[in-house]
């Protein structure tokens, strides 16, 4: 892609998200979401491949449907209450419609069906943008309106997403689909606590973005997209293989890695709110997710691929890929748990 076009598209992504962040009027927020969608569409279709075009088409149709629902919900709310302000979403029908539309936008279960298929058709860097940056603007709107939305709807979306994210990833052989189901499960953790402690949702979103960025960058560095090729990565780069395994365990929420922090705090908050059954369900759903992360780690570090020839290990050769972003995200993914008290002080 032409670098000038790429710069314009990335700037438009930033502009759309910033516009949604800064707006208090429904039409401006909707416009920001649409700029985001239109900016990422050419990035998704830049590789002239049938799968990429199919993924782009699915994504565009899904986002257009969600955008139409948001516009309809906001006009319904304005018709019933006379208010266009985002925080004055008081009509029950508009509330439900709006939350359903945003759930479709970020891929919450049961509106998640597009997410694994779209992510599978993209390259890893575009998939990274879709899994991280594209979640920011919808979450800004959800956080602003969470207190007006039916708590039962939020709880159902959260529990369903964590269960579907766990079950869906169990039998997958494609790493991008596994990361898509991982994203769905993490979205569920954020939504379940948003009505009780929005600052914990922001903390979970921040750690999710860091961990997912580290996962995508490590997989891109090792040139791996399938579980079957994970077994060959140790001969190419043993250190990168060990790092990838730790990043995946952090995504699964295993202590003492960073991913344990948001899950622990969210379970603590749910218990404080006298919701032990929901907290137990979420913890068990996290165990299901942890299984497929452990399966990936087993394939990477505890299996040896068939090798009949005595070949020299290529891991001493210099890599041509940029490793600074990978190093930063990996360090944050593995080592932020001891800083939990400081992070809580900053977020509360």
UniProtKB/Swiss-Prot annotation:
Keywords: Electron transport, Membrane, Mitochondrion, Mitochondrion inner membrane, NAD, Respiratory chain, Translocase, Transmembrane, Transmembrane helix, Transport, Ubiquinone. The keyword Iron-sulfur does not apply. GO terms for cellular component: mitochondrial inner membrane. Its EC number is 7.1.1.2. One of its GO terms (biological process) is mitochondrial electron transport, NADH to ubiquinone. The keyword Electron transport applies. It comes from the Eukaryota. It is a multi-pass membrane protein. One of its GO terms (molecular function) is NADH dehydrogenase (ubiquinone) activity. It is found in: Mitochondrion inner membrane. Core subunit of the mitochondrial membrane respiratory chain NADH dehydrogenase (Complex I) that is believed to belong to the minimal assembly required for catalysis. Complex I functions in the transfer of electrons from NADH to the respiratory chain. The immediate electron acceptor for the enzyme is believed to be ubiquinone. This is NADH-ubiquinone oxidoreductase chain 2. The lineage of its organism: Eukaryota, Metazoa, Chordata, Craniata, Vertebrata. The gene is MT-ND2.
């Amino acid at each position: 892609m032409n670098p000038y076009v790429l710069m314009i598209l990335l700037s438009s992504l930033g502009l759309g998200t910033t516009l949604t962040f800064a707006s208090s009027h429904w039409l401006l927020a909707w416009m920001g979401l649409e700029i985001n969608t239109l900016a990422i569409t050419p990035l998704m279709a830049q590789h002239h491949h049938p799968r990429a075009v199919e993924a782009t088409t699915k994504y565009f149709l899904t986002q257009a449907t969600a955008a139409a629902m948001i516009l309809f919900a906001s006009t319904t709310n304005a018709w019933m209450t006379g208010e266009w302000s985002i925080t004055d979403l008081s009509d029950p029908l508009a509330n439900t419609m709006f939350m359903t539309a945003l759930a479709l936008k970020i891929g919450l279960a049961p509106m998640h069906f597009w997410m694994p298929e779209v992510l599978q058709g993209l390259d890893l860097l575009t998939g990274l943008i879709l899994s991280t940056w594209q979640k920011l603007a919808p979450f800004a709107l959800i956080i602003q309106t969470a207190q007006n939305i039916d708590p039962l709807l939020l709880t159902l979306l959260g529990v369903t997403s964590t269960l579907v994210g766990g079950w869906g990833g169990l039998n997958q052989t494609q790493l991008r689909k596994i990361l898509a189901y991982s994203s769905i499960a993490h979205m569920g953790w954020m939504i379940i606590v948003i009505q009780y402690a929005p600052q914990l949702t922001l903390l979970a979103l921040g750690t999710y973005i860091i961990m997912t960025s580290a996962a995508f960058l490590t997989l891109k560095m090792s040139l791996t997209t399938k579980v079957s090729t994970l077994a060959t990565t140790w001969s190419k780069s043993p250190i990168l293989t060990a790092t990838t395994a730790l990043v995946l365990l952090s995504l699964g929420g295993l202590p003492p890695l960073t991913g344990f922090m948001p899950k622990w705090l969210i379970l603590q908050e749910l218990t404080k709110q006298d919701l032990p059954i929901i907290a137990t369900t979420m913890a068990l759903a996290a165990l299901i997710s942890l299984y497929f992360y452990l399966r990936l780690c087993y394939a990477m570090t505890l299996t040896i691929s068939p090798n009949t020839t005595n070949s020299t290990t290529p891991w001493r050769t210099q890599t041509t890929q940029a490793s600074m972003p990978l190093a930063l995200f990996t360090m944050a993914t593995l080592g932020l748990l001891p800083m939990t008290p400081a992070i809580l002080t900053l977020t509360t």
